């Protein structure tokens, strides 16, 4: 979703209004990114958790209102498998999947939660991110890198700025 910000950065659209767009990485009808990375992309759980932290960092530093889904903030790996081998995931997609709160009892779960807490505080306490003007600075498509930033220009003499460099390559 963040890649799409480039399209709207220099055009007056509702997407520029930080109070209009709801952003999310997963929703109720999708598997978690962690599940997809581990089950389908051959990531280890640790690699998937690190990648999820990166995506969360982009989510919380981009325009709009971030939305989290059940346990995402502590690395809950939710999704479905084709356990009976018939290629039909519908039953499992619709089944009740309670959050596994025991994840918070291990170091990975706590580390993940701490990262999300820091992102929430950064967004809450940094006026450049929460109230500032968005700037689409650079895009290096071949290298899968984007650079964007914010400047709090609400008061004269205020020079609060944030620059985000996001490298999407492995």
Regions found by a protein language model. Name each.
Residues 1-81, 124-130, 134-135, 139-170:
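Conserved alpha/beta catalytic core and glycan-binding cleft of carbohydrate-active enzymes
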């Amino acid at each position: 979703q963040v890649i799409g910000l480039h399209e709207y950065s220099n055009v007056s659209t509702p997407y520029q209004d930080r109070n209009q767009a709801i952003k999310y990485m997963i929703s109720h009808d999708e598997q978690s990114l962690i599940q997809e990375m581990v089950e389908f992309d051959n990531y280890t759980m640790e690699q998937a958790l690190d990648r999820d932290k990166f995506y969360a960092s982009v989510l919380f530093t981009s325009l709009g209102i971030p939305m989290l889904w059940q346990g995402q903030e502590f690395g809950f790996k939710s999704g479905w498998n084709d356990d009976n081998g018939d290629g039909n995931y519908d039953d499992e997609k619709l089944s009740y999947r309670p959050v596994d709160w025991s994840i918070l009892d291990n170091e990975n779960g706590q580390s993940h939660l701490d990262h999300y807490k820091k992102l929430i505080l950064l967004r809450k306490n940094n006026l450049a991110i929460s109230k500032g003007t968005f700037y689409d600075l650079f895009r290096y498509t071949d290298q899968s890198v984007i650079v964007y930033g914010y400047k709090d220009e609400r008061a004269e003499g205020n020079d609060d700025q944030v620059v985000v460099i996001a490298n999407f390559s492995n």
